[in-house]
A protein has these predicted regions:
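Glycine-rich phosphate/pyrophosphate-binding beta-alpha loops
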Residues: 47-49, 326-329, 342-353
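Acidic, Mg2+-coordinating active-site environments of NTP-dependent enzymes
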Residues: 72-74, 165-169, 173, 199-340, ...
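Short, conserved loop/helix-junction motifs that constitute active-site signature segments
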Residues: 55-59, 76-78, 195-199, 229-234, ...
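Active-site beta-alpha connecting loops in nucleotide-dependent enzymes
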Residues: 47-53, 327, 357-402
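Active-site glycine- and acidic-residue-rich loops that bind
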Residues: 148, 152, 179-186, 342-352, ...
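N-terminal leader/targeting and accessory segments in enzymes
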Residues: 1-95, 99, 292
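Phosphate-binding loop of NTP-binding sites
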Residues: 92-240, 246-254
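Short internal beta-strands
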Residues: 61-68, 204-207, 239-243, 369-372, ...
Length: 402
């Protein structure tokens, strides 16, 4: 690859040297500045003159940025160092992901998971089931949700590092934010862009609900962001939550339906009826499930459906679900007596579901105390909707602490 091709792919302009800095070209990987070595490419949302100096001193192939600051361009010209400036940094991160998978994991079967709620739990459960088959699996899901935004080259770095350190991957399980932005600006069709880069053979769409207010301001806008994801999945299998009306408006080529209801005109492939059924046969009893709450059982259904679509043996899927231990802050029981539940719910639907499911666990007439932290960084509008969700969930036996 020559630098002009790279700049063309990501719709960028080259400042400074019009070829890669090292005569050998791009010989490394996409990564971060502090971790980069000779021949690597670094993607940063913003870079200053000092950053360009560091990149040149490390003999990097080039830098890619959306926001050059404090003399970065002048320094690139002075050092004759290639700096590619883009209008959309997401094009660079998507290209980095695509290139990395093609180079380091060309034979893996890839799964993407997107939607408003349940992405992390579904992704982590799929990862666990696959790992339980003794396959080599990588996921970008973690309990702090630090690696699932795909707005920087972290996942590309994770993939290349994992393959270099531990060998060939069998599966990639990639969580994709349904809506993404930077500095208050929507990265339009982010989910489609990243899903296309992964080239999944299976995709999961959990639900479509409001979150990320400010980047999107209506449920129609959320739908527009997710609507193109089935196109990225193409002829692969798209696992759909049949109980979500908006999800069922999507038109994938090869849908796989999962539902919390047994009987339906379209006959969901996997459903819950005091246990999980596949093709009418009970495969997991209630006591086998790691979750008892409605919304988390939906995540189990999606994970089971995804693994069936990957041709994983039902016995291995069952063993994986039975042995699963949830991520931190996903309806985690911190204490039994008194009952204390910790959950990461951070949008209206998630908050309502968490309160409703926790309330079901209480003995009759016992008081439920809901302690909720409102994060200022989330924005005024989403916080307003979250508070409204809290208020709507209240009854005489629920007390709220903000």
């Amino acid at each position: 690859m020559i630098i002009q091709d790279l700049a063309s792919f990501i719709e960028g302009n080259i400042i400074g040297k019009d070829s890669f800095f090292d005569d050998e070209g791009f010989t490394g990987r996409f990564t971060f500045l502090n971790d980069a070595i000779d021949g690597d490419i670094v993607i940063r949302h913003k870079i200053n003159d000092k950053g360009v100096e560091i990149a040149a001193s490390k003999n990097l192939a080039c830098l890619i940025t959306q926001n050059p600051q404090d003399g970065a361009c002048d320094k690139a010209i002075e050092l004759n160092f290639p700096l590619i400036i883009v209008d959309k940094i997401e094009l660079a991160t998507a290209y980095a992901l695509k290139w990395t998978i093609e180079k380091f994991s060309p034979d893996s079967k890839n799964v993407i998971i997107t939607g408003t709620n349940g992405k992390s739990t579904t992704s982590h459960l799929i990862y666990h089931i696959l790992k339980n088959t003794e396959s080599h699996v990588l996921t970008n899901t973690d309990s702090e949700s630090e690696f699932n935004t795909l707005i920087d080259p972290m996942v590309s770095k994770l993939i290349s590092d994992e393959v270099k350190n531990n060998g060939k991957l069998d599966y990639l399980v990639i969580e994709v934010s349904e809506v993404q932005g930077w500095l208050g600006n929507l990265m339009k069709h982010h989910a489609y862009l990243m899903a296309s880069a992964v080239k999944p053979c299976v995709g999961v769409i959990t639900n479509i609900a409001m979150d990320h207010i400010g980047l999107v301001n209506s449920i129609d806008e959320v739908f527009d962001e997710i609507n193109q994801v089935p196109n990225a999945i193409g002829d692969g299998v798209t696992v759909l939550n049949y109980d979500d009306d908006l999800v069922m408006k999507l038109t994938p080529n090869n849908p796989f339906l999962c539902s919390m209801n047994k009987f339906d005109s379209k006959n969901p492939h996997v459903y819950y009826d005091d246990g999980i059924f596949y093709e009418g046969n009970l495969i997991l009893e209630n006591n086998d499930l790691p979750f008892t709450s409605h919304h988390f059982i939906q995540n189990i259904l999606s994970a089971v459906a995804a693994c069936i679509s990957l041709d994983i043996d039902i016995k291995n899927i069952v063993e994986g679900v039975k042995s699963y231990r949830p991520l931190n802050r996903r309806f985690s029981k911190l204490h039994e007596n008194p009952l204390i539940v910790d959950d990461f719910a951070h949008n209206p639907d998630g908050i309502k579901a968490t309160i409703a499911e926790t309330y079901k666990l209480l003995p009759k007439n016992q008081t439920l105390y809901v302690v909720c932290s409102i994060r200022g960084s989330r924005g005024v509008e989403i916080n307003k909707l979250n508070v409204e969700a809290l208020v709507e969930s209240m009854n005489d036996n629920i007390k709220l602490v903000l």
